Amino acid sequence: MSHPEEMPVDGTLDATGLNCPEPVMMLHQHIRDLPPGGLLKVIATDPSTRRDIPKFCVFLDHELVDQQEQAGTYLYWIRKNSV
């Protein structure tokens, strides 16, 4: 399988500089706009997203394909559930 950074995405959410709860609120809107099975890349700088985004995915049954940290930036690849 490809590395997440090489996978084509259906949308990107840049939440750089935003603090809780804004990244998750924006994520909710962006994921809603994706087609079922669509892949969203999220870029964030708020450390609380390490806790909040995985919980968001579990609660709403989306797949957290991968998450990475690169020099204080948090990257997430989320596949929208197909329901």
UniProtKB/Swiss-Prot annotation:
Q: Does the keyword Transferase apply?
A: no
- The chain's coiled-coil residues are none
Q: Which Gene3D superfamilies match?
A: TusA-like domain
Under SUPFAM superfamilies, the record lists: SirA-like (SSF64307)
Spell out the GO cellular component terms annotated for this protein, sorted alphabetically and separated by semicolons: cytoplasm
Localization recorded for this chain is: Cytoplasm
What does the UniProt keyword field contain?
Answer: Cytoplasm
Q: Which InterPro entries match?
A: Sulphur_carrier_TusA (IPR022931), TusA-like (IPR001455), TusA-like_sf (IPR036868)
Looking at the keywords, is rRNA-binding present? Answer: no
Check the record and name the CDD domains matching this protein.
Answer: SirA
Q: Could you name the active-site residues?
A: C20 (cysteine persulfide intermediate)
Q: What family classification does the UniProt entry report for this protein?
A: Belongs to the sulfur carrier protein TusA family.
Q: What does this protein do?
A: Sulfur carrier protein which probably makes part of a sulfur-relay system.
Name the record gives this protein: Sulfur carrier protein TusA
Per the UniProt record, the source organism is Pseudomonas fluorescens (strain SBW25)
